């Protein structure tokens, strides 16, 4: 019942933001996540969920996937304006769900910051994860690249969905070894 009222409050707040001609970015998600850090469990998803992650190129790739699916006639919910941490993704979901948490879409396509893969998808369905690259970036938040890769590797140990990895980046390609029982691992390369 608590989550119902959180979603209701965020719907009202979103309406106020629209009236004021404001997007709100990750504001709705920040409030909802503060009120209940396990709110991702509340949402009901009956469509494929695709996540794109990388240090560089995730926004363009995410938006290309979403645009391609929309052009094919699908209803796509996506965080096309960025907001790729847990609160931004949660804001996108809150704007597109019913009060009971049902998300009406043919596809959910999310750009997700590399360090937030384990946070968002611990309690939220994920069917396909695309990882493009890792570079030394935002050391204050992510730490060294190796520690980031190890956190994602730990998440992937129990992940059995589609995993699409850039074989040209050795740090990305090695994530395919995280869960030997996952038969849904695919690699791409420029060659």
Q: For each of these PLM feature ranges, what is it?
A:
Residues 2-189:
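Phosphate-binding loop of NTP-binding sites
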